[in-house]
UniProtKB/Swiss-Prot annotation:
Keyword Magnesium: no
Induction (free text): Induced by amino acid starvation, glucose starvation, the DNA cross-linker mitomycin C (SOS response) and when translation is blocked. Induction is decreased in the absence of the Lon protease suggesting, by homology to other toxin-antitoxin systems, that Lon may degrade the YafN antitoxin. Transcription is negatively regulated by the cognate locus, probably by this protein. A member of the dinB-yafNOP operon; it has 2 promoters, 1 upstream of dinB and 1 specific for yafN-yfaO.
Domain of life: Bacteria
Protein name: Antitoxin YafN
Transmembrane region(s): none
Homology family: Belongs to the phD/YefM antitoxin family.
GO cellular component: toxin-antitoxin complex
Lineage of producing organism: Bacteria, Pseudomonadati, Pseudomonadota, Gammaproteobacteria, Enterobacterales
Gene this protein is translated from: yafN
Keywords: DNA damage, DNA repair, DNA-binding, Repressor, SOS response, Toxin-antitoxin system, Transcription, Transcription regulation
Disulfide bridge map: none
Amino acid sequence: MHRILAEKSVNITELRKNPAKYFIDQPVAVLSNNRPAGYLLSASAFEALMDMLAEQEEKKPIKARFRPSAARLEEITRRAEQYLNDMTDDDFNDFKE
């Protein structure tokens, strides 16, 4: 069973006749074969949703997604070593944390 997460719904055939009619201030489920294929939102509803998501993201710590392969880590290490070897004493003296 598929959940429909909107109070209003429209099938794709009806949506094609007049799409602008369904961009209202609440979500509209778009159905295909009586199953939700997607949802329509007005610009203001979408902006409000994005604002809520941004607020939530600010409250949560960021999860790292940097998971390089062993070969990629070796390449990063090799390049870092090369950069360090190429640095001059002046480069090291200019470093500030």
